[in-house]
């Protein structure tokens, strides 16, 4: 990745782990960024991002990768976000927020929802559910609400590396839309 300039040497990131097999390659960096390459998918994640993608190198890395391999037929691009939301009794909060009272309510353990919104060239899928997570200020796993968003856009041009880079460049716009939507849904 450094040789091709996908992860520039000037960032001084050390590789903490690599896995390389014919169908799968994974590179984990000390910065918290992981690059996963499968036959039909490139995924770049950053585990150390808080408050949006503004300080993350994910879009820059993914854009550099597709520029290095412009001959690949890219069919879609996605910006994905995850938030952990603390609430007292997350299961009860979601049941009260999204489910009408009735006899079905009493024996129900949890409520999870999936919402799908149209985008110009794709769709936004927003999933809200409960789960457990290790929070920075807590020693044990805590019950939380987990929100996952996938802004998926279809590529229509070939070569499409420029279109993929354009879609990846919408990360901050997508984050703002996600934050606003999640705030409106959860409050």
Feature roles, as predicted:
Residues 124-187:
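Mixed-charge, glycine-accented linear interaction segment located at domain edges/termini
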Residues 27, 32-41, 45-47, 55-60, ...:
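Amphipathic N-proximal alpha-helical interface segments
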Residues 18-19, 68-88, 105-120, 175-187:
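Short glycine-rich, low-complexity/disordered patches
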Residues 41, 47-53, 85-87, 151-163, ...:
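A generic structural motif
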Residues 1-47:
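N-terminal low-complexity, intrinsically disordered segments
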């Amino acid at each position: 990745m450094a040789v091709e300039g996908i992860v520039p040497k000037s960032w001084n990131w050390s590789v903490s782990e690599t896995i390389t097999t014919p169908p799968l390659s994974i590179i984990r960096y000390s910065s918290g960024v992981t690059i996963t390459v499968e036959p039909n998918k490139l995924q770049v994640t950053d585990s150390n991002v808080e408050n949006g993608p503004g300080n993350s190198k994910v879009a820059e890395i993914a854009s550099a990768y597709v520029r290095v391999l412009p001959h690949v037929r890219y069919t879609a691009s996605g910006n994905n976000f995850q938030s952990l939301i603390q609430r007292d009794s997350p299961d009860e909060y979601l049941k009260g927020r999204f489910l009408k009272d009735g006899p079905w309510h009493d024996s129900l353990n949890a409520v999870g929802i999936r919402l799908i919104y149209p985008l110009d060239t794709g769709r936004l899928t927003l999933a809200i559910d409960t789960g457990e997570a290790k929070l920075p200020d807590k020693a044990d796993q805590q019950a939380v609400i987990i929100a996952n968003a996938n802004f998926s856009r279809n590529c229509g041009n070939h070569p499409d590396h420029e279109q993929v880079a354009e879609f990846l460049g919408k990360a901050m716009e997508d984050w703002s839309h996600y934050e606003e939507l999640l705030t409106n849904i959860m409050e």
